């Protein structure tokens, strides 16, 4: 139930560290980690111990009945701008942290589809599972017209990529790619340790 998610009552225990890389977003030297079904608090502590040069921030989304894979719920587009699944909103107290650090969180556009494709058990919110190439360029699944339109209005160059047939393998564009190697150094994107 959503009450269990809001109360952070998950099926996982705290016996052993557990985390899924898909529950982690990199914001330069800051890592945003979703506490949920596939990442427990011991796993988050493990990340803190092993990534001492990064700030680790824990988030949760009470509107998500199955909190796994943060990239269909919360996605940074460029420094200062994040899209959030409007059905799984970041709680106000956690939003305040981003607001204080000059990050705007906006609702993602509604998915163009009412159901996933055949053999896919992922959420229709793979619509917001985008691949950011740089602060001006975003790859979006080609049939997700609502998301493409929103990003275009936000000033991004939108690159449509036909990828819906791959959803049955469990993810979208962000899930199916490794980190993009970028020129320059890893930046501190103005998030502070809380």
Explain the meaning of each model-derived region.
Residues 1-191:
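The feature marks the mature, well-folded catalytic cores of soluble enzymes
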